[in-house]
């Protein structure tokens, strides 16, 4: 028998890495066990740990160092102790302050939130659970040190940097402020993982404990200060502030936040009563079928069904009655639903705002005080600044920050509404307002998110999220839009006339765009399985939008909406006589083929718009929402009730609700089992609704027996109309549009015979040979008729002159298919056009007659018939597909209907002394405009399709887009994390870095002096000489430079030098950061210019407008430009390096005669 091999111990961390990290933990002195005493090498140890975190964990995407530090209890055992020691004793010591700052730098990466994503390695799965639990311990240690005030100590470290004006603030100061805020954000994010075993009390790290700690240690005061001054003094800290606010308020009920103690106690009592009532209801339902002491013997019965089949049902409860037996049979049925692909779940727990969070009364009081102060002072500055940063796509903005922004705006708007509601209740109870609040409050405190820019941003975000199927982002956008609508509704009811006018203007802008209406409808119809939070948001948005739109349309009878559609330019009958070249023609054809957006205003009809919500998909969405009736509150149940009432009784589309599963749901809500609690206020309304629906169902079954079958299926529009009214909907047939006119590619054929052969071959390939034969017969009969007429007319001419012409011949056919083809078949129409057939009249509609004009002689008709017969007999002799040789024909007239010719308008004025007014147009046409337009078309040659013709984006494309956005987010996040180290925080001065800096400066000065000496000896610089030679190529070598060239070249040099700026990085927290000065070295690269042009949006964020260095650079460039201009004007000859020529006695060369062309001055470089 083989011996069992003992299991080997798996090393989760490389032993060498563990030994290196543990060797760094030696910065403390253990002589006194009762007091934490720093060792001499404490600062060096902290610096080494920081290097290991940055160079090992972040560079190799591992978590070994963080795991070792967690096992060694570095945070609670050392870093927090050092910060508390600094707070008590070392605030005046510069050395201790540097050590404390190094501790904060370590706390930020160690507390950075850990997310579970799809690209995790084995190492991540091994370390993340432990590190998540360790971070909870870190947070517990930071919050529990209230006596020492760890958070207050962190704020104290950043206060000196805050006090410095922005123009004098260095990169180190900005870095200190960033790590301070990121540490606060990490503390707000860290929560206990429900999947892991909790160590200690969960209340110590809960949201309530975090809020209380932030209030007690002045974190809320810091946030208020930064938010209210974010646009002026702290413009790079808006995103961390937004994230802190989001993680502080997500999931908290706004209504409970602004309740007083009595209301909160009553609310809590009602919730407890509801839970007890649900429990008693569940017990009653269970007691109906619960086993008794006597029911110890099994029971099995046979049930004979209507189709003479037998079914087996077991259990004594089936003996009670027939209904119970059938219900037991239904419960035993199992539907083998087809399995689909596993749905990709969003595992980012830290950004979930659908899960409700409960906080303690003390935390509620503290948070309410902060929210009120934030609404009064910091709401507008912060959210306006964040919105602008998101619109600019700043490098510091991640994709998740848009979701943070939208949800936080919606939450604070709801808080403002709740605060006003509580104030009104307080005033109603007291009977009068306080003396300091005699005037009603204006909505100016939240006006920063009620402007047109926010609406444009919100609509764009909703549309992008809907197109890319980013459901969480769309959920946040819908919540934001709903709160904006509710806020505007309250503004319209404000006693201030100014607020009423603003609300009227906002509603007009929101409801004016029909695209907004269509988007709301598409969101409601597109629900599948996005979760209850998304379902709640989309149903609430549609309910609020419909209700407000109905009220607004009633008060504004003449309401107009703007509908946008894509339309194509209609073909014009007349064509321009003069045609351009083939290339020009192709470009113009593609230009005319592009679909353009057309805007059209029309009167709004609310009944017509509400009818769009009367379809089966919208009903299914609200049915899915109603299935959660046991968990819904009164407002949500009322929302669903109002929708079904609108469908059944306002829109008269009751048949949409006549489906077995919907009727079963409504019956179960009222009668059970597991029905709605009858004590709820909304129960009576639901009961009456269900009763009326059942009554109408019975009547409808008597009128329409076919409804019995249709109860099993969803109703399409035609079926619903028939079941409702008893007859099919009458549709009015409209005349069809003529097909697009075709033409033969001029490159493929030049003679009429070749064109006819190509068209005949195309018809034959499309199996339309019968049409070609019919046309041949028409030509033959027309030739015979025309020949007889010509002979007869010849005899008449011999007798005497006549004035009559040859009669026209109508193209007729007894076959209806040929008649339809004359209008619908574009190739047949092209063939008749090439044969010089004409249409009677100018209208191109179905049924119009084609004729053979009198100008065509019998010989011409016979020649055309011979060509067609030959092409039909021989077939296609070309290897190319004849269909590829045909193309659409477009009119070359201007699309706006303007003829393009200049009007002979005279703008002469006698007051200006004009005696003779020239004839003709005042401003002749620009002969080069057409060429520019063609070049632009060639560069932007892209055909757009109609929205209805666009194919839906498949899942693979969406997944590729998601992966691209995810990679971009990870790159930005990695940049933020890797830069979260304060530059020069370890030392105020670095001798090695200074020595390297001075050495480089010495080399640059030496190179510059050599270039100056060489320029003085040669009379020019090498680069300038090369440029001058290139510029003067083809000219006489002895021709002197004219003033225009000198001035132009100087301007070009100044322009190129002006773009040579170093963009400051968004996150400047980097070790050993160098800012090379390219201006001093005189080197400039075109790649740098391209990079600068591509990052103009980022440059707006990174450039501090109060930075003296930034303005100093601009002033230096301006002064240099002014000096050059002055020197050029004063000195006759000036070299490129700015030095005057040594030969001052050389006579000045006379200026060249200015060249004139067509009355315009032509400079030397304008060729």
UniProtKB/Swiss-Prot annotation:
GO terms for cellular component: replication fork protection complex. The keyword DNA damage applies. Residues 1078-1088 have a biased composition (Polar residues). GO terms for biological process: DNA repair; DNA replication checkpoint signaling; meiotic cell cycle; replication fork arrest. Keywords: Cell cycle, DNA damage, DNA repair, DNA replication inhibitor, Meiosis, Nucleus. It is found in: Nucleus. Residues 572-582, 959-969, 996-1013, 1110-1127 have a biased composition (Basic and acidic residues). Residues 583-593, 949-958, 1062-1074 have a biased composition (Acidic residues). Signal peptide: none annotated. Residues 332-353, 563-594, 889-969, 981-1093, 1105-1167 are annotated as: Disordered. InterPro entries: Timeless, Timeless_N. Its main location: nucleus. GO terms for molecular function: DNA binding. Involved in chromosome segregation during meiosis and DNA damage repair. This is Topoisomerase 1-associated factor 1. It comes from Emericella nidulans (strain FGSC A4 / ATCC 38163 / CBS 112.46 / NRRL 194 / M139). The lineage of its organism: Eukaryota, Fungi, Dikarya, Ascomycota, Pezizomycotina.
């Amino acid at each position: 028998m083989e011996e069992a091999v003992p299991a080997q111990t798996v090393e989760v961390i490389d032993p060498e890495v563990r030994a290196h990290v543990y060797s760094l933990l030696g910065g403390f002195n253990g002589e006194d066990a009762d007091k934490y005493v720093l060792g001499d090498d404490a600062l060096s140890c902290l610096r080494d740990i920081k290097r290991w975190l940055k160079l090992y964990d972040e560079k190799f995407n591992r978590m070994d160092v963080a795991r070792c530090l967690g096992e060694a209890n570095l945070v609670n055992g050392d870093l927090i102790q050092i910060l508390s020691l600094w707070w008590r004793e070392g605030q005046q010591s510069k050395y201790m302050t540097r050590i404390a700052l190094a501790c904060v730098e370590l706390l930020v990466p160690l507390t950075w939130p850990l997310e579970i994503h799809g690209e995790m390695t084995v190492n991540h799965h091994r370390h993340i659970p432990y590190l998540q639990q360790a971070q909870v311990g870190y947070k517990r240690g930071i919050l529990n040190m209230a006596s020492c005030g760890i958070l207050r100590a962190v704020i104290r470290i950043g206060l000196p940097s805050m006090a410095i004006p922005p123009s004098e603030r260095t990169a180190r100061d900005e870095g200190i402020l960033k790590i301070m805020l990121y540490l606060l954000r990490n503390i707000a994010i860290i929560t206990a993982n429900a999947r892991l075993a909790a160590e200690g009390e969960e209340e110590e790290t809960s949201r309530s404990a975090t809020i209380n700690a932030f209030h007690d240690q002045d974190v809320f005061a810091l946030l208020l200060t930064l938010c209210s001054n974010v646009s002026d003094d702290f413009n790079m800290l808006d995103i961390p502030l937004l994230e802190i606010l989001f993680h502080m308020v997500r999931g908290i009920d706004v209504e409970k936040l602004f309740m007083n103690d009595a209301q909160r106690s009553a609310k809590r009592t009602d919730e407890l009563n509801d839970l007890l009532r649900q429990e008693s209801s569940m017990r009653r339902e269970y007691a109906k079928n619960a086993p008794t002491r006597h029911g110890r013997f099994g029971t099995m019965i046979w049930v004979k069904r209507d189709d003479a089949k037998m079914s087996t049902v077991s259990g004594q409860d089936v003996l009670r009655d027939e209904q119970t037996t059938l219900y037991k049979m239904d419960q035993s049925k199992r539907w083998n639903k087809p399995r689909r692909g596993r749905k990709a779940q969003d595992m980012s727990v830290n950004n979930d705002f659908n899960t409700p969070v409960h906080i303690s009364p003390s935390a509620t009081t503290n948070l309410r005080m902060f929210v009120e102060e934030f609404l009064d002072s910091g709401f507008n500055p912060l959210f306006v600044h964040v919105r602008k940063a998101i619109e600019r796509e700043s490098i510091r903005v991640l994709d998740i920050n848009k979701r943070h922004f939208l949800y936080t705006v919606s939450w604070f708007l709801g808080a403002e509404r709740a605060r006003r509601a509580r104030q009104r209740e307080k005033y109603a109870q007291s009977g009068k307002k306080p003396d300091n609040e005699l005037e009603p409050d204006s909505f100016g405190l939240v006006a920063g998110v009620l402007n047109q820019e926010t609406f444009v941003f919100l609509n764009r975000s909703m549309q992008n999220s809907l197109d890319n199927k980013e459901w969480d982002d769309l959920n946040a956008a819908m919540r934001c839009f709903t709160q904006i609508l509710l806020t505007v509704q309250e503004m319209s009811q404000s006693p201030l006339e100014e607020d009423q006018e603003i609300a009227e203007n906002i509603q007009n802008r929101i409801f004016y765009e029909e695209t907004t209406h269509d988007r709301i409808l598409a969101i409601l119809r597109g629900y599948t399985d996005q979760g209850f939070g998304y379902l709640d948001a989309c149903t609430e948005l549609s309910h609020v939008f419909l209700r407000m739109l109905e009220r607004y349309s009633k008060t504004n009878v003449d309401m107009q909406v703007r509908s946008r559609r894509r339309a194509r330019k209609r073909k014009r009958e007349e064509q321009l006589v003069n045609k351009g070249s083939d290339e020009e023609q192709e470009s113009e054809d593609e230009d005319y083929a592009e679909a353009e957006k057309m805007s059209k205003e029309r009167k709004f009809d609310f009944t017509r718009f509400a009818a769009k919500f009367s379809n089966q998909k919208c009903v299914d969405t609200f049915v899915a929402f109603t299935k959660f009736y046991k968990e819904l509150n009164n407002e949500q149940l009322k929302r669903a009730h109002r929708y079904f009432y609108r469908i059944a009784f306002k829109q008269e589309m009751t048949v949409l609700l006549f489906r077995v599963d919907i009727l079963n749901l409504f019956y179960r809500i009222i009668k059970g089992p597991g029905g709605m609690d009858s004590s709820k206020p909304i129960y009576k309304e639901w009961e009456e609704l269900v009763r009326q629906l059942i009554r109408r169902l019975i009547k409808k079954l008597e009128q329409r027996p076919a409804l019995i079958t249709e109860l099993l299926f969803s109703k399409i529009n035609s079926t619903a109309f028939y079941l409702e009214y008893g007859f099919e909907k009458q549709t009015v047939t409209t005349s069809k549009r003529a097909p697009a006119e075709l033409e033969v590619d001029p490159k493929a054929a030049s003679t009429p015979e070749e064109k006819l052969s190509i068209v005949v071959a195309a018809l034959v390939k499309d199996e339309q040979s019968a049409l070609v034969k019919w046309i041949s017969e028409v030509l033959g009969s027309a030739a015979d008729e025309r020949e007889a007429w010509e002979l007869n007319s010849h005899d008449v001419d011999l007798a005497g002159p006549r004035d009559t012409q040859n009669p026209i011949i109508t193209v007729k056919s007894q076959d209806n298919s040929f008649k339809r083809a004359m209008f619908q078949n574009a190739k047949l129409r092209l063939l008749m056009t090439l044969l010089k057939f004409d249409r009677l009249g100018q209208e191109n509609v179905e049924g119009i007659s084609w004729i053979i004009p009198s100008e065509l002689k019998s010989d011409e008709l016979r020649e055309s018939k011979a060509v067609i017969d030959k092409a039909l007999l021989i077939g296609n002799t070309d290897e190319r597909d004849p269909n590829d040789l045909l193309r659409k024909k477009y009119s070359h007239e201007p699309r706006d209907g303007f003829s393009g010719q200049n009007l002979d308008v005279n703008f002469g004025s006698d007051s200006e002394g004009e005696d003779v007014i020239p004839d003709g147009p005042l401003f002749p046409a620009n002969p080069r405009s057409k060429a520019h337009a063609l070049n632009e078309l060639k560069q932007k040659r892209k055909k757009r399709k109609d929205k209805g013709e666009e194919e839906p984006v498949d899942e693979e494309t969406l997944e590729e887009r998601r992966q691209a956005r995810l990679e971009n987010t990870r790159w930005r996040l990695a940049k933020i994390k890797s830069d979260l180290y304060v530059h020069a925080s370890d030392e105020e001065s670095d001798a090695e870095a200074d020595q390297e800096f001075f050495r480089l400066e010495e080399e640059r000065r030496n190179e510059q002096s050599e270039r100056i000496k060489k320029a003085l000896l040669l009379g020019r610089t090498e680069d300038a000489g090369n440029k001058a030679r290139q510029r003067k190529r083809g000219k006489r070598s002895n021709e002197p430079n004219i003033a225009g060239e000198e001035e132009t070249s100087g301007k070009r040099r100044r322009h190129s030098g002006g773009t040579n700026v170093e963009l400051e990085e968004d996150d400047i927290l980097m070790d050993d950061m160098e800012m090379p000065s390219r201006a001093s070295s005189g080197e400039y690269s075109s790649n740098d210019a391209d990079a600068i042009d591509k990052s103009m949006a980022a440059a707006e964020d990174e450039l501090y407008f109060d930075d003296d260095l930034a303005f100093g650079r601009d002033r230096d460039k301006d002064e240099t430009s002014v000096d050059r201009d002055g020197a050029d004007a004063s000195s006759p000859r000036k070299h490129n390096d700015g030095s005057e020529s040594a030969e001052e006695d050389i006579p000045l060369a006379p200026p060249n005669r200015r060249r004139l062309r067509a009355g315009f001055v032509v400079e030397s470089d304008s060729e």
